[in-house]
Amino acid sequence: MSEEFPIVAITGASGSGSSSITKAFEHIFFRERVRAAYIQGSAFHRYDRKEMKKQVLKAREEDQELSHFGPDANHLDKLETLFFQYASTGTGMSRYYLHSKKIAAEWGQESGTLTPWKELDSDTDLLLYRGLHGAAIDGDIDISSYPDLLIGMVPNVNLEWIRKIKRDTSLRGYSRKAVRKMILRRMSDYVHHITPQFSRTHINIQMVATVDTSDPFGVDQE
């Protein structure tokens, strides 16, 4: 923990509502004139989109499953290093995962690729992380020990799946069938690596549906 360079981490799975909490913090920071270093958890994915597909197939050949929910598809060591360095000096290295064609075009890259690693601005007041592993523990890696405030977006899985299906099909170019397969492939890592983090957070928030979410895949036409 660091009084001089505090870290806030918002942790939750795809579709959990973490982006809404992030926006709330952005409004607070703007009003209070707080300069934040915004970190996306996807920056620490180990593979770009094309290579990830290859690695998923390779894992299946070995009777294994690989997903971004688990540690093997991510640089958790680099994320821990960032948190350690920022808490100590207010600096560190990060990058971006370019999810959509629109964002990728701004970088002159293809969607699903990663930008080069870059040093954070040295004049920030705090670091705000939003991603899958803000409270993760894996072997000797203990990311949960660094944030001064850990917020968990706890599961409401049917609502999460509905939001993920809508986002990935409308913004990221996936078919509904592909998103459904992705959800199924991630289930083991969801149980073993995502949900345990919510016992380490300081505050947990759960989104409540105001519409029928009984069958997230009921409108699947493929």
Regions found by a protein language model. Name each.
Residues 1-2, 121-123, 188-222:
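NTP-dependent small-molecule kinase module
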Residues 21-22:
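Post-Walker A alpha-helix
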Residues 111-170:
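ATP-dependent NMP and nucleoside kinases share a basic, alpha-helical "lid"
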Residues 37-40, 44-103:
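Conserved nucleotide-sensing/catalytic segment adjacent to the nucleotide-binding pocket
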Residues 27-37:
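Post-Walker A helix-loop "phosphate-sensing" segment adjacent to the P-loop in P-loop NTPases
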Residues 18:
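Conserved lysine of the Walker
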Residues 8-11:
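Short hydrophobic/aromatic beta-strand immediately N-terminal to the Walker A/P-loop
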